[in-house]
UniProtKB/Swiss-Prot annotation:
Ubiquitinated, but not targeted to the proteasome. Sumoylated. Sumoylation with SUMO3 may be predominant. The lineage of its organism: Eukaryota, Metazoa, Chordata, Craniata, Vertebrata. Residues 455-466 have a biased composition (Polar residues). PANTHER family: DNA POLYMERASE DELTA SUBUNIT 3. There is a cross-link at K258, K261, K433 (Glycyl lysine isopeptide (Lys-Gly) (interchain with G-Cter in SUMO2)). It comes from the Eukaryota. GO terms for cellular component: cytoplasm; delta DNA polymerase complex; nucleoplasm; zeta DNA polymerase complex. Accessory component of both the DNA polymerase delta complex and the DNA polymerase zeta complex. As a component of the trimeric and tetrameric DNA polymerase delta complexes (Pol-delta3 and Pol-delta4, respectively), plays a role in high fidelity genome replication, including in lagging strand synthesis, and repair. Required for optimal Pol-delta activity. Stabilizes the Pol-delta complex and plays a major role in Pol-delta stimulation by PCNA. Pol-delta3 and Pol-delta4 are characterized by the absence or the presence of POLD4. They exhibit differences in catalytic activity. InterPro entries: POLD3, POLD3_sf. The gene is POLD3. This is DNA polymerase delta subunit 3. Residues 169-188, 199-232, 274-393, 406-466 are annotated as: Disordered. Residues 349-361 have a biased composition (Pro residues).
Length: 466
């Protein structure tokens, strides 16, 4: 009766649950001895094949026996499929045992699934792994917990001792106390290549010396005082010179740029057109400016002047920062009004329009309305809009030249005379074009002359210092 229940359980595992049933798995699952599990599997296969000859069952066998190989006899244990059982039996000299190892529905390609099945069941029964086994040893007794803890401590101590020895050996080599390494003497190439190699070695030695001296100077400068700013460090690293000398030169360069900006401001204010100021005052202010510049240059004559490279860089920056802006061309209109004593009042110049990024073409000629005469035949005084250039400093401190329309008063007779003279000498379009070019060149030449004067004074100051 019990055997019948076991066979039904095996049939359920194989057919219904589609499991791989090994003799070890069956012994642990049903709690029977391994030899009994093997016998149960064999009985199940025999009964199943008698009942249904076409039953789909794949069986693996555990075969053991003696084998003569290379003139020596050896004991062989193998797990083979049913189709290879006869071939393995023929190779064995003496067959010791043949047992059913596993039963499954699917055909196995290798022994991996069999190993996984046994591994999982043994892992879940580690404490009683030899309970149902046929191999047993009575002398094998489990250790007490105290003995196991002491043995683990001894193992840890020995492991720590070994690790400390390895660390000591590593420290000897890393800290420089180890045996000196043999120097690899590289053979220098002969001839021209040898000359180049020796020159390269000398250059590397010189660069190492220079870097050491520069590092010493930087440390001395940092300990001496707090005069060196952050910008000085950046500039000294960039130009690759001594730290303290570059700090002084950078301070002088900043002060010189500030003074040049201060000098440029009055020049711009002089060039702004003011109708109320007379021409005599303008000339006197222009003469007074170089005197002020010379006085300021004398005051800072003791300082170190800028080098030629730095002056070129500042001039290039100034040239880049100059911009010429043209306003949008408005439709020009002439205003006609009768001659009166109050018509000679000077108008204030219109404020400069906002700077427009694209440069729009300047209109060459403006349409002039026909001359208007009164019924009495008198000439009328007219207001005419004329395109003039204006220079001023913007918010960034750049010199900006702008074309601005200004109104001028003229009579019909004066206008006719101007038209006649211009038609005799040159076409009217050329006069309108050349006026802004000449006026543009004026302020640029003035600023260039000022820059040259500043540079010459600074160079003379540099030679006086030396």
């Amino acid at each position: 009766m019990a055997d019948q229940l076991y066979l039904e359980n095996i049939d359920e595992f194989v057919t219904d649950q589609n499991k791989i049933v090994t003799y070890k798995w069956l012994s642990y699952t049903l709690g029977v001895h391994v030899n009994q599990a093997k016998q149960m599997l064999y009985d199940y296969v025999e009964r199943k094949r008698k009942e249904n000859s076409g039953a789909q069952l794949h069986v693996t066998y555990l075969v053991s026996g003696s084998l003569i190989q290379n003139g020596h006899s050896c004991h062989k244990v193998a797990v083979v499929r049913e189709d290879k059982l006869e071939a393995v039996k023929s190779k064995l000299a003496v067959t010791a045992s043949i047992h059913v190892y596993s039963i499954q529905k699917a055909m196995l390609k290798d022994s991996g699934p069999l190993f996984n099945t046994d591994y999982d069941i043994l892992k879940s029964n580690l404490q009683n792994c030899s309970k149902f086994s046929a191999i047993q040893c009575a002398a094998a007794v489990p250790r007490a917990p105290a003995e196991s803890s002491s043995s683990s401590k001894k193992f840890e101590q020995s492991h720590l001792h070994m690790s400390s020895e390895t660390q000591a050996n590593n420290e000897l080599t890393t800290n420089g106390h180890g045996p000196p390494a043999s120097k690899q003497v590289s053979q220098q190439p002969k001839g021209i290549m040898g000359m180049f190699a020796s020159k390269a070695a000398a250059k590397t030695q010189e660069t190492n010396k220079e870097t050491k001296t520069e590092a010493k100077e930087v440390t001395n400068a940092s300990a001496a005082g707090n005069k060196a700013p952050g910008k000085g460090n950046m500039m000294s690293n960039f130009f690759g010179k001594a730290a303290m000398n570059k700090f002084k030169v950078n301070l002088d360069s900043e002060q010189a740029v500030k003074e040049e900006k201060i000098v440029e401001q009055p020049t711009v204010s002089v060039t702004e057109p003011k109708l109320a100021t007379p021409a005599g005052l303008k000339k006197s202010s222009k003469k007074a400016e170089p005197v002020k510049v010379l006085q300021k240059e004398k005051k800072r004559g003791k300082r170190v002047a800028l080098s030629d490279d730095e002056t070129k860089e500042t001039e290039n920056m100034r040239k880049k920062r100059r911009r010429i802006k043209l306003p949008e061309s408005d439709s020009s209109e002439d205003e006609v009004f009768p001659d009166s004593p109050g018509a000679y009042e000077a108008e204030s110049p219109s404020p400069p329009p906002p700077p427009s990024p694209p440069l729009e073409p300047v209109p060459k000629t403006e349409p002039e309305p026909p001359s208007v005469k009164s019924s009495s035949g008198e000439n009328k005084r007219k207001r005419k809009r004329v395109l003039k250039s204006k220079t001023y400093l913007d918010g960034e401190g750049c010199i900006v030249t702008e074309k601005v329309y200004e109104s001028e008063s003229c009579t019909d007779s004066e206008e006719e005379l101007n038209m006649k003279t211009s038609s005799v000498h040159r076409p009217p379009a050329m006069t309108v074009k050349k006026e802004p070019r000449e006026e543009r060149k004026g302020p640029k030449k003035g600023t260039a002359a000022l820059g040259k004067a500043n540079r010459q004074v600074s160079i003379t100051g540099f030679f006086q210092r030396k």
